[in-house]
Design a protein with these regions (language model features):
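A short Gly-Trp-Pro
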Residues: 1-133
Length: 133
């Protein structure tokens, strides 16, 4: 299955092929800051699943474990598109909110729950990890 998506201004478009390895809610502090929200919902996949068109910029970051992460975003409007999780080989975390159709992107687990907002209640039916393992 192929899914399409893109940034807010339309300068970046992509097609992602195949199914996600997982759909994950991440509560880490950096995902909160990048999204400007309480968490980020990510399509976890392989870097060869995404065909990207447009000008993306990269912010080199470190995750909460101290590992490098390349955060890719639209160079025009700043919309986060995906992150390359360098410590995990060719894994990417595609921002689900950038997909044109999110109707089948139900999260399966939550990670970095140790960093969640104190006022946020976790779904007790969904597996949760205090960190990422």
């Amino acid at each position: 299955m192929a899914r399409q998506g893109g940034c807010l201004c339309g300068q970046v478009r992509y097609e992602v092929l195949g199914e996600p390895l997982a759909v994950v809610i991440c509560h880490c502090k950096n995902c909160q800051k990048q999204s400007g929200s309480t968490f980020s919902i990510n399509f976890i996949g392989q870097s060869d699943q995404i065909n990207l068109q447009g000008n993306v910029a990269t912010y080199v970051d470190q995750n909460d474990s101290g590992d490098p992460v390349n955060r890719k975003f639209c160079a025009s409007c700043g919309s986060p598109i995906f992150s390359e999780i360098l410590s995990q080989g060719n894994l990417i975390a595609l921002k689900v909110g950038t997909l044109d159709d999110t109707s089948d992107m139900e999260p399966q687990t939550q990670v970095w729950c140790v960093s969640k907002q104190n006022w946020l209640s976790l779904d007790t039916d969904m597996p949760t990890l205090m960190r990422n393992t």
